[in-house]
């Protein structure tokens, strides 16, 4: 996504209109030029890359567009790492300790570097050169990190990502959002709801799979203390929504007026005909590494119980519940498993409230011992579900023991 200073939009009354680039020859040429620059910058430093990007921007009026495209290439397609033969913090500690005993000068600095290299050569039992000490001294600073990998997108894919990011930026200042997910393939609903669960969005849900759902989401500016992190979470939902066939969205915004400096109301609307392209995979998503790890371990376990990912939606007042897994025995017995991992207190309260309202007697809750349920206002004794406690990993053995009780 894009930072606030690279978001571009215009206002049509109260309606906000994000900047969207056309896939024309000029725009694609700019995208291709930037991609080529990143490809040629591989194995160089971030600082060198940034200087080349600044030179490419020049004094042209479209510098913010170029900067936005470059930001996406940097954050989504590039991998930077500290490359140093020696540990930079250790080198600085040694060099600074010796330098403090001397009068600063170019000669003294070189002598200090040589002295540290000699000390390390003796300690490590192999030769350490002064050039290695110099190279490693500040190798961990961002500008000195090395571009070790660049997964080049096509120019078209980069422009699509830019257009999506401009629209996502609208939701940083959302106070209220309503999504109408019209009648769709049930699998699309499930994927959308799983992403909502993943991003821990505070949502009121009405409807059913036969007629569609209306989702009301509180935005980051509606919270008692506006949260940038929560605004980013809402923005991350949009690529998931694009996988739903028929939908519409309306949002109320808190916009900063650049002339008066005051905040005023704004509106934004978009639907499934918007032409935006998602970069999220259309298939199943795991809500956490906990779930993915549990699946891997279950597949290696020796048991008749079969673990299934596809679980029906459980309607409850004002929401739906999507258990993480169904466990099925050949004799017909079934249980639903919900993993309760590392969630915010308000989300924990909502989750346990959902369990109480579900009216299910076949539910297993796998609860992390790291959670402070009492502080979150949750009394687990009031929860009508079988409980499995876990620390870092959820083990199939613990779940199977509960199943056989």
Regions of interest found by a model, annotated:
Residues 1-405:
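Electrostatic, structured charged patches in enzyme active sites and in nucleic-acid/phosphate-binding
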């Amino acid at each position: 996504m894009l930072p606030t200073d690279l978001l571009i939009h215009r206002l049509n009354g109260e309606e906000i209109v994000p900047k969207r680039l056309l896939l024309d020859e000029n725009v694609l040429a700019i995208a291709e030029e930037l991609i080529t620059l990143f490809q040629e910058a591989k194995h160089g430093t971030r600082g060198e890359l940034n200087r080349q990007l600044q030179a490419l921007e020049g004094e042209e009026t479209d510098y913010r567009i170029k900067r936005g495209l470059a930001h996406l290439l940097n954050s989504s397609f590039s991998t930077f790492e500290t490359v140093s033969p020696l540990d930079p913090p250790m080198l600085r500690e040694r060099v600074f300790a010796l330098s403090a005993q001397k009068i600063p000068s170019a000669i003294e600095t070189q002598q200090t570097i040589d002295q540290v290299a000699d000390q390390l050569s003796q300690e490590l039992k192999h030769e350490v050169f002064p050039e290695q000490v110099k190279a490693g001294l500040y190798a961990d600073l961002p500008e000195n990190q090395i571009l070790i990998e660049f997964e080049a997108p096509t120019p078209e894919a980069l422009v699509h990502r830019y257009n999506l990011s401009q629209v996502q930026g609208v939701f940083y200042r959302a106070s209220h959002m309503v999504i109408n997910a019209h009648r769709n393939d049930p699998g699309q609903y499930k994927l959308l709801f799983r992403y909502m669960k993943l991003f821990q969005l505070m949502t009121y849900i009405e409807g059913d799979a036969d007629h569609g759902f209306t989702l009301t989401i509180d935005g980051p500016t509606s919270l008692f203390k506006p949260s940038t992190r929560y605004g980013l979470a809402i923005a991350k939902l949009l690529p998931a929504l694009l996988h739903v066939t028929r939908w519409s969205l309306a949002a109320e915004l808190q916009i900063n007026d650049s002339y008066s400096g005051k905040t005023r109301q704004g509106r934004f609307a978009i639907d499934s005909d918007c032409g935006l392209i998602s970069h999220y995979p259309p298939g199943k998503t795991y809500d956490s590494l906990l779930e993915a790890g549990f699946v891997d371990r279950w597949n290696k376990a020796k048991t008749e119980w079969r673990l299934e990912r596809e679980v029906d939606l459980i309607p409850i007042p004002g929401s739906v519940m999507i258990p993480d897994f169904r466990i099925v025995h050949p004799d017909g017995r079934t249980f639903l498993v919900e993993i309760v991992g590392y969630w915010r207190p308000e989300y924990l309260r909502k989750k346990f409230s959902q369990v109480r309202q579900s009216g299910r007697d076949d539910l297993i809750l796998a609860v992390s011992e790291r959670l402070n349920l009492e502080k979150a206002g949750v009394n687990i004794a009031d929860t009508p579900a079988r409980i499995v406690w876990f620390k870092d990993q959820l083990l199939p053995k613990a779940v199977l023991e509960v199943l056989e009780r």
